[in-house]
Amino acid sequence: MMNALNYLPLPLVKALAFFREELSEERPGRVPQTMQLWVGCLLVVLISMTFEIPFLALSLAVLFYGIQSNAFYTKFVAILFVVATAMEIGSLFLIYKWSYSYPLVRLIVAGVILLGCMFMMRAHRLGLVFFAVAIVSIYGQSFPGMLDYPEVVVRLTLWCIVVGLYPTLLMVLIVVLWFPARAADQMREALCARLDDAASRLTQSAEPLPEKRIEQEALALQKLNVFCMADDADWRARSAWWQTCVTTVTYLYATLNRYDAAAFAKNQAIAPLRQKLQSEIAALQNAISNGETWHSEWQLSAEETAAARECGLENACQILRQLGQMDPDTPPAPATKPPSMAPDAFTNPNYIRYALKTLLACMICYVFYSGVDWEGIHTCMLTCIIVANPNLGSSYQKMTLRFGGAFCGAVLALLMTIFVMPWLDNIVELLLVLAPVFLIASWIATGSERSSYIGTQMVVTFALATLENAFGPIYDLAEIRDRAFGIMIGIVVSAVLYTFIWPESEAKTLPQKLAGALGLLGKLLRVPRQQEAAAQRTYLQLRVGVHAALNSCEEICERVALERQLDDDQRLLLVKRSQAVIQQGREILYAWDAAWNDAQALDNSLLQERAGRFADALEKYAAGLAAAASTPPIIELIDTAISPTLYQQEQRVMQQMARLPDWTRPALTPAEEQVQGAAQL
């Protein structure tokens, strides 16, 4: 297999590696969500074909957008869909009432609604509602132009209520009532899986997992915690303990990922400590699987403390011990509710520009397919709304996913129309043929955000070409051609407009986000290095925040790499520097974890002064990123009352900080190996 890959083009090899990673991704709840979506799709086809309900592709799209990873999230989205359906139909009837016989007025009214919806989609937390209203309003206004009878138009519009609401009811029955997937159960499964990984690292030597995966797992646990808080009363009552449990498991999973078990395999003094640590992890795992809080009386003896310090496990032991001794009824910190609207919604011109660009793209597509009298390519207008994203990089990503999904769906529809459809006689045979297509699309759609839209688009394109408004076999290949051409035209129009009209590049945002991540890391460095529970909980919370910030920066970096309107050399230089900052930020974090091990037993006032110097240097570097004026920090340590081991660990932190890229040089230069500055003893 590897020999065959050597002869393939590099982009194709990268694409294959990407799809292999996406298709093999495991996360709690993915298999149940896939099965729920698969069964829901088959039921929708059966119901729509039996009762001759039009717009089958739209009903399938409701399922793919609505069925989420857990019952609470699905219920929340279902409520949004009901609200969106009411707003959609209401806006359509207003358009018809005021401007049915006046195409220009009708287009202007629909354009105003689209403009407002796209603005709210960008500025409001519930952007999904306005996204749905935008699509229906701009497409629904074209019904009077296609049909000469107002009664038929009204009837089709009323059918849209059924088309949108009965899949919503179906997904509530399947996901919320009949086969509920609770967030708390998924959280317990995820925590136990992460503890399994951490415990195995204590005895088995293996290649460390990529840091990006570690950060994604940490973020997944934080998202699940939000759902547990909203859905589970017991979790909410003891939210402080469970939040500490989540951050503790994240810390163990991340730090033990780099633990080298082979380096201490022959050290007999460390073996009892590892066994004790494994038994404590197993006890915590058992309590979590039973949905209970965990209590432990473990106290590290002098021998265990010395062994833990020798192998770099002291901090892990102390943090695990603090969790075992934490009061489950500790009151949680007061939660802050985020605002519904973006703080700069009415001051930032990018929001209204975003809406205007989308409106212009839709109008160009509408005028084009109306002018050439090619109604079949109406998907070009819908594509302009679907691929509209706040920045160029994410828009290009969405365009690629939409094209890929449409291509796969069109190919499957073509093959089915030519080779399968002539042999079908009844609905059972049709469902048997559709089952594998829906299963594959459901598995893709339940993956990560990097590829999930391919599954949704594949099913919608396939349904538009083979199942839409026809309650029997279809042999018209023109439908497949029209849908594919419409999507391609919409992508081309959107790409041109978003690139040359008010392009929203993240090239300026990326250094600011990097500065924010390093600022959060500097805040972590200032946390008192003590064995007190409050200090350790603060440290763990900030540590998760650093993971999230660095992961966000890496995602922005990937999007900036797609912004071809930038100068190639400048773009590559920015991406390389940013990747270097992200990598060194991670290394500084882990180096500081090691320094925390030995620091807790020393005088805190002295350590705080030393930690402040590291934090000051890092914050100074972060402050210059926006202006590209950052140079590797210079740190001077004068204090002498410090242990040799801690001094060596702080030297490693200094070395990692010195390897941060120099943004004042015209090109990225290899990082210097020596620490810049002086460290005086």
Task: Enumerate the predicted regions with their spans.
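C-terminal functional regions that serve as terminal interaction/effector modules
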Residues: 419-420, 424-431, 435-439, 447-475, ...
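A compact, surface-exposed functional segment
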Residues: 110-114, 119-122, 185, 190-201, ...
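Pore- and pathway-forming membrane helices of multi-pass small-molecule/ion transporters and channels
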Residues: 11-19, 34-75, 85-90, 107-174, ...
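Juxtamembrane/interface segments at transmembrane-helix termini
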Residues: 126-130, 176-189, 448-452, 478, ...
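Hydrophobic alpha-helical transmembrane segments corresponding to the first two to three helices
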Residues: 398-402
